[in-house]
C-alpha cells in the first residue's frame, strides 16, 4: 500500500509522521503544524495496515477531540478519492466508517469508557450519571459537608460522653470570629489535591509526618534536613556571593579597605556554618547566625566620585547580607528549640485531625454520590486507574493488546495521575507511546498540570531514531506568523527563559524558526508595537488600578480606531492578496477576564463592535449584582448594602439625593427601618416635590417586596426569579444596555442555575444565596456565551481561550499585571509535592505562629509562584506570538 509523503512537510515533520517502534516525544512549538502531523501520522498508520479503532488518541479538550476526528475523516476521504487501486480505496472507506467509534477523545472520556466496560472488576454499579456541572458538584459537596461538620460539632465521631475538643481547636485555627468558612476552604482544597494523586488516602495520611519532632532534636529530623536545610544553605550561599563582591569592591580603594575586616569575619562565620550545617543543633544555628551578623556601617572619609560609586555598591551588598541573615533569624529561629518543638507537636495534632476530618468528608461524599448514582471527573480517573491497576487486570491486558499506539496531544498539560493511566495502557514490547506538546505553552498549573513530565522526557529521550528506546523530535518552524513576529518572540524568550526559570533553555532547538514563506516579500511588514499609557498627575484617580485598566482600554480603542480609519491593509491567506482590515481580524488577549467590563463599556463609547468570547466576570456584571442584592433583600431586608444597591438600581431608581433624604429623616436605624419610617411619617406638605418622588418609588417597591417575599416562602426559587423579571421588566431593561444580549444571557443563566439547584433536591432561598456566594468565592462563572460567531466584531478572550486560534492583529493587554501571591497570605499553604503547611494559632496567647512546614513550603512556593507567573507571561508571548500573522501591539 502507498506510503504517505507530503512534499510540504519539513524533514522533522516527516520524521514525526514516519518513525515508530519506540516512544516518541515531539516538542512542537506553537504554529508548527503539530495537528497536521498528528493527523498525517494516523493516516500513515492506516496506510501501513493499522485499523483506526486500534489507536488511542488523547486530546486535552472535547473541542480538540472533535476537530481531530473531523480532520482524520477529511484526510481519509481525500486519500480515498485520490486512491487508484480498488483495494486501497475500499480499505480507506472501511476505515472512514470506523472513525466515529474510534477512541479519539479526552482522557476523561476514555476513563468513562473503561469504567462502563470493566465496572465488574471493582464491583461497581454500571448505572450512573456523570456530574459534569462544576456548580452542581459543589452544591452536593456543600450539602454533605454541612452534615459532616455538624456531626463533628455535635461530637458524633467520638465515644459517648467524650468531647471532640480537637475539632473545635481545628475550626478556630482556620476560621474567624464571623464564620468557619476557613475550615471549609481548607477541607475542600485538600480533597481536590488528594484526588489529583494516584492514591488520595496515602497522600493525605503522609501530611502529618512533616510535623514529627525527632528525639535527637529539631535539626535532626528528616524534614529539617530535606526541606529547611537547603533553604538555609541557599540563603547563606547568596550571602557569601554578595560578600565576595563586597570584598572585591573594598580592594578598589584604600579608603574602602576599612570594610575588609568586617567582611572577612562574616565570610568566615558563614563559611563555617555552611560546612557544619548538617550537624548543627537548633541553638547553634541561632547563636552562629547571630554572631555572623554584620556590625554597624563604617564611616569613611570624603570620597572621590568613583570611590563613592563603589562604596554605594559595597554598602548595598552588605545591607543585603544583613537583611538575609536577620530574615533567617526572624523567620526560622525566632523561638528557642523547646518552644518551636511544642508548636510543631500542637500543629501536628491539628493536621492529623484535619486529615481525619477530610477523610471522613471524602467517605461521606463518595457514599452520597454512590447513593445518587453519580460520578464526578476525579472519580473517572481514580476508578479507571483502580480498574487498570488490579492484579492481572483484564482491562489492562485488553487495552495493551488492543492499542497499537497511544497518541497524546498537549502532553505538557498532563498530571501524574493521568500519566499513570496512560502508562497502564501502553505496551512494553515494543513501546508505542507518541506524545506531542510544548513545555513553553503549559499554562494549566492551576489544574495541577505537571510540565516536568514533559521536561524529563525531553532531556532523557534520544535525538535520533537509532536510539531505539526513545526519540525526541523537534518541530520549531512557525507556519502562522510573519518573520517580525517570530523575531520579537525569540527576543523576549532568549532574555527570560532558561533551565531554572522555564524548564528548558531557550536555545536554537526551542526558538521559533520562520516557516510562513507564503507571505509575499514585496509587501511591507508591520512592526511590533508597545503602547504605553501614562497618567498625568492632574488626571490621576484615587484608585490606580482602575486608572490603569481604563487607560489601557482607551489606548487600545484609539489605536483600533486609527487602524480602521486609515484602512490598514493585511494579507489574506485564503484570498492570497492584500485587503482592508476588518473588525473580525482583531483580537484582544489578556491573562484574566478582569478588564472585560471596561472593554464592553469603552468600546461601545468609541463605536467599536466587540464580542466577549470567554465568559466574562459573571458575578461582577451590573445586572447579576442587582439580582443577587434583590434576592438577599427578599431573604432578609435588614441588610443595608444590598438594600441600598436595589434602591439605587433601575428596579427602583432612587438617586443619591433621594437616598440621602431617607437617611436624613432617620439617622440611627438600619436603612430598612428608615424606609419604613419615611413612609410612615410621610407628610406631603413638608417633604416637597423630591419627597413626593421618593414616596412614590418606595411605595411601589415595598409592594413588590412584600409580594416577592410571599412567593419566596410559598413557591420555588425559579418562580420567584421569573416573577421578578416579569414584574420589574428588568430582563427587558438590560436588553437595551450595551452588550444587551450578553446581559440577558447572564440573567437567564441565573434562572437556569436556580432550576438545576431545585431539580437536585435543594430548597430554600437562604441556602441558594449561600450557594451562589460559594460560587463567587471560588470564581465559578455561570455566564452563557452569546452566539455571535459570524458578526464582524473585535474578539476579546483570555490567553487560555486563544490556544490554536489565529488572528491577523493581536492586542496583548494587561502586560504590567503583578504576580498574584494571594495564596501565600492564608493560614495554610498547599503543594502537591511539599504537602501542607499551617499557621498555628496559640489560642491562649492569641498568637499566630508559622510552623516549619509552612515556612518551607511558602519559601519554595513563593519562588515557584514567581517562576510560574513569569513563565505564564512568557508563554502568553509565545501563544500570542504564534497566532499573529500581521501586527502585534502590546
From Swiss-Prot:
Gene3D superfamilies: P-loop containing nucleotide triphosphate hydrolases (3.40.50.300). GO terms for molecular function: 3'-5' DNA helicase activity; ATP binding; ATP hydrolysis activity; DNA binding; exonuclease activity. Transmembrane segments: none annotated. Heterodimer of AddA and AddB/RexB. GO terms for cellular component: cytosol; DNA helicase complex. It comes from the Bacteria. This is ATP-dependent helicase/nuclease subunit A. Keywords: ATP-binding, DNA damage, DNA repair, DNA-binding, Exonuclease, Helicase, Hydrolase, Isomerase, Nuclease, Nucleotide-binding. GO terms for biological process: double-strand break repair; recombinational repair.
Amino acid at each position: 500500500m502507498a506510503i504517505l509523503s507530503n512534499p510540504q512537510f519539513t524533514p522533522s515533520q516527516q520524521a514525526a509522521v514516519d518513525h515508530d517502534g519506540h516512544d516518541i516525544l515531539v516538542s512542537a512549538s506553537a504554529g508548527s503544524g503539530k495537528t497536521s502531523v498528528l493527523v498525517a501520522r494516523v493516516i500513515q498508520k492506516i496506510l501501513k495496515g493499522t485499523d483506526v479503532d486500534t489507536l488511542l488518541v488523547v486530546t486535552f479538550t472535547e473541542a480538540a477531540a472533535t476537530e481531530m476526528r473531523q480532520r482524520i475523516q477529511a484526510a481519509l476521504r481525500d486519500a480515498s478519492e485520490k486512491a487508484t487501486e480498488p483495494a486501497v480505496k475500499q480499505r480507506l472507506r472501511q476505515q472512514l466508517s470506523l472513525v466515529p467509534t474510534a477512541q479519539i477523545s479526552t482522557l476523561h472520556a476514555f476513563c468513562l469508557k473503561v469504567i462502563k466496560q470493566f465496572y465488574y472488576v471493582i464491583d461497581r454499579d454500571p448505572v450512573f450519571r456523570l456530574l459534569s456541572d462544576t456548580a452542581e458538584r459543589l452544591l452536593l459537596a456543600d450539602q454533605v459537608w454541612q452534615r459532616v461538620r455538624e456531626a463533628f460539632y455535635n461530637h458524633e465521631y467520638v465515644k459517648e460522653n467524650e468531647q471532640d475538643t480537637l475539632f473545635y481547636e481545628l475550626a478556630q485555627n482556620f476560621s474567624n470570629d464571623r464564620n468557619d468558612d476557613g475550615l471549609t476552604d481548607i477541607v475542600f482544597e485538600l480533597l481536590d489535591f488528594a484526588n489529583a494523586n494516584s492514591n488520595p488516602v496515602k497522600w493525605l495520611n503522609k501530611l502529618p509526618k512533616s510535623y514529627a519532632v525527632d528525639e535527637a532534636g529539631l535539626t535532626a529530623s528528616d524534614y529539617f534536613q530535606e526541606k529547611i536545610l537547603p533553604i538555609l544553605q541557599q540563603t547563606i550561599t547568596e550571602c557569601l556571593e554578595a560578600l565576595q563582591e563586597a570584598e572585591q569592591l573594598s580592594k578598589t580603594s584604600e579608603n574602602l579597605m576599612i570594610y575588609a575586616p568586617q567582611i572577612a569575619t562574616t565570610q568566615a562565620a558563614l563559611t563555617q556554618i555552611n560546612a557544619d550545617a548538617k550537624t548543627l543543633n537548633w541553638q547553634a544555628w541561632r547563636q552562629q547566625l547571630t554572631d555572623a551578623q554584620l556590625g554597624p556601617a563604617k564611616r569613611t572619609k570624603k570620597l572621590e566620585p568613583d570611590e563613592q560609586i563603589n562604596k554605594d555598591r559595597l554598602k548595598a551588598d552588605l545591607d543585603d547580607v544583613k537583611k538575609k541573615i536577620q530574615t533567617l533569624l526572624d523567620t526560622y529561629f525566632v523561638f528557642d528549640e523547646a518552644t518551636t518543638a511544642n508548636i510543631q507537636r500542637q500543629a501536628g495534632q491539628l493536621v492529623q485531625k484535619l486529615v481525619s476530618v477530610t477523610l471522613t468528608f471524602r467517605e461521606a461524599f463518595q457514599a452520597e454520590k454512590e447513593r445518587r448514582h453519580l460520578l464526578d471527573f476525579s472519580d473517572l480517573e481514580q476508578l479507571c486507574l483502580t480498574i487498570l491497576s488490579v492484579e492481572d487486570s483484564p482491562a489492562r491486558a485488553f487495552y495493551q493488546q488492543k492499542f497499537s499506539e497511544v497518541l497524546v496531544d498537549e502532553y505538557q498539560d498532563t498530571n501524574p495521575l493521568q500519566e499513570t493511566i496512560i502508562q497502564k495502557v501502553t505496551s512494553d514490547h515494543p513501546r508505542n507511546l507518541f506524545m506531542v506538546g510544548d513545555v513553553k505553552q503549559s499554562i494549566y498549573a492551576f489544574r495541577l498540570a505537571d510540565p516536568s513530565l514533559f521536561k524529563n522526557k525531553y532531556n532523557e529521550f534520544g535525538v535520533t531514531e537509532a536510539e531505539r528506546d526513545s526519540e525526541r523530535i523537534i518541530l520549531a518552524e512557525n507556519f502562522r506568523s510573519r518573520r517580525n513576529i517570530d523575531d520579537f518572540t525569540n527576543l523576549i524568550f532568549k532574555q527570560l527563559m532558561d533551565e531554572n526559570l522555564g524548564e528548558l533553555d531557550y536555545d536554537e532547538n526551542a526558538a521559533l524558526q520562520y516557516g510562513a514563506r507564503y507571505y509575499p516579500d514585496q509587501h511591507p511588514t508591520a512592526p511590533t508595537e508597545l503602547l504605553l499609557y501614562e497618567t498625568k498627575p492632574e488626571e490621576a484617580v484615587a484608585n490606580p488600578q482602575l486608572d490603569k485598566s481604563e487607560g489601557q482600554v482607551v489606548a487600545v480603542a484609539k489605536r483600533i480606531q486609527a487602524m480602521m480609519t486609515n484602512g490598514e491593509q493585511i494579507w489574506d491567506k485564503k484570498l492570497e492578496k492584500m485587503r482592508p482590515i476588518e473588525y473580525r481580524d482583531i483580537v484582544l488577549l489578556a491573562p484574566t477576564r478582569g478588564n472585560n467590563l471596561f472593554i464592553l463599556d469603552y468600546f461601545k463609547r468609541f463605536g467599536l463592535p466587540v464580542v466577549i468570547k470567554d465568559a466574562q466576570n459573571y458575578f461582577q456584571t451590573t445586572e447579576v449584582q442587582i439580582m443577587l442584592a434583590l434576592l438577599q433583600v427578599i431573604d432578609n431586608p435588614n441588610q443595608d448594602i444590598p438594600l441600598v444597591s436595589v434602591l439605587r438600581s433601575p428596579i427602583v431608581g432612587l438617586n443619591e439625593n433621594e437616598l440621602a433624604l431617607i437617611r436624613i429623616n432617620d439617622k440611627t436605624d438600619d436603612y430598612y427601618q428608615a424606609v419604613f419610617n419615611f413612609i410612615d411619617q410621610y407628610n406631603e406638605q413638608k417633604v416637597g416635590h423630591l419627597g413626593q418622588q421618593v414616596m412614590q418609588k418606595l411605595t411601589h417597591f415595598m409592594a413588590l417586596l412584600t409580594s416577592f417575599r410571599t412567593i419566596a416562602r410559598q413557591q420555588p426559587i425559579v418562580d420567584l426569579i421569573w416573577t421578578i423579571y416579569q414584574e420589574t421588566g428588568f430582563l427587558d431593561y438590560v436588553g437595551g444596555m450595551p452588550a444587551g444580549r450578553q446581559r440577558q444571557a447572564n440573567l437567564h443563566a441565573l434562572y437556569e442555575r436556580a432550576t438545576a439547584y431545585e431539580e437536585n433536591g435543594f430548597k430554600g432561598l437562604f441556602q441558594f444565596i449561600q450557594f451562589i456566594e460559594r460560587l463567587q468565592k471560588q470564581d465559578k462563572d455561570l455566564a452563557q456565551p452569546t452566539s455571535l460567531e459570524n458578526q464582524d466584531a473585535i474578539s476579546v478572550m483570555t490567553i487560555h481561550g486563544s490556544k490554536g486560534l489565529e488572528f491577523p492583529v493581536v492586542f496583548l493587554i494587561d502586560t504590567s499585571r503583578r504576580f498574584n501571591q494571594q495564596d501565600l497570605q492564608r493560614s495554610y499553604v498547599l503543594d502537591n509535592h511539599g504537602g501542607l503547611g499551617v499557621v498555628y494559632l496559640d489560642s491562649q496567647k492569641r498568637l499566630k505562629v508559622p510552623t516549619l512546614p509552612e515556612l518551607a513550603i511558602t519559601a519554595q512556593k513563593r519562588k515557584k509562584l514567581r517562576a510560574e507567573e513569569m513563565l505564564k507571561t512568557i508563554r502568553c508571548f509565545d501563544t500570542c506570538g504564534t497566532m499573529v500573522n500581521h501586527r502585534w501591539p502590546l
